[in-house]
Amino acid sequence: MKIKKIKNFSTINQAERFAKKNIRKGTFDWLQAGAENGFTRNKNIKDLENLKILPKVLKGIKDTKISTNIFGFKISSPLILAPMGHQTQFHSRGEVETAMAFNDQSRLAFFSTQGRMSLRDIRRKNKNAIIGWEIFPFGDKKWIEKEIKDAEKFKCFSICFCLDANVRSHRY
């Protein structure tokens, strides 16, 4: 899949229009659909539509440092990248490329067994990234133990389990 060079976007809508033009329809629909029946996605959209920033609340703030400490790391902002599976649908090196944005050790990122790039590949190209590893327990006990050992071997700061998806979704 050949995608035009990605531009800087000012809005989510601009990024969405770009993606819709440049990604295969089935892949774009999958990206937009949300898990299972889309309940969480739709609720999140509704909640975000009700969120308002009141400028007077931020009036007079001169120091906008938002860095914080979490899990023993000083990070540049309290935002953490949640794991997203199947990124290779959108870029041939998927999670490896995403992790590059976290290689400066100022932000936390989670990746998961639902990705198509191995933890080994992600870490090989991103030695300094602060990475957490999420395990979907679809495999047997031996496989899960291997994933835990790999997370330790590749110096993940955290290991977590996705326990609400112990069976594969009916949508895929």
Regions found by a protein language model. Give the residues of each.
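A structural motif shared across PLP-dependent enzymes of the aminotransferase-like
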Residues: 36-39, 89-94
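Hydrophobic faces of well-ordered beta-strands that scaffold small-molecule active sites
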Residues: 79-82, 107-111, 131-135, 159
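Conserved, mostly hydrophobic/aromatic
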Residues: 24, 81, 102, 161
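Active-site mouth loops of central-metabolism enzymes
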Residues: 80-92, 133-142
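An N-cap/entry alpha-helix motif that binds or orients negatively charged groups
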Residues: 2-72, 171
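Alpha/beta enzyme core
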Residues: 86, 100, 125, 141-172
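Short, acidic/turn-prone active-site loops that include or flank metal/cofactor-
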Residues: 115-117, 135-139, 165
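A glycine-rich phosphate/pyrophosphate-binding beta-strand-loop-alpha-helix module
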Residues: 94-132
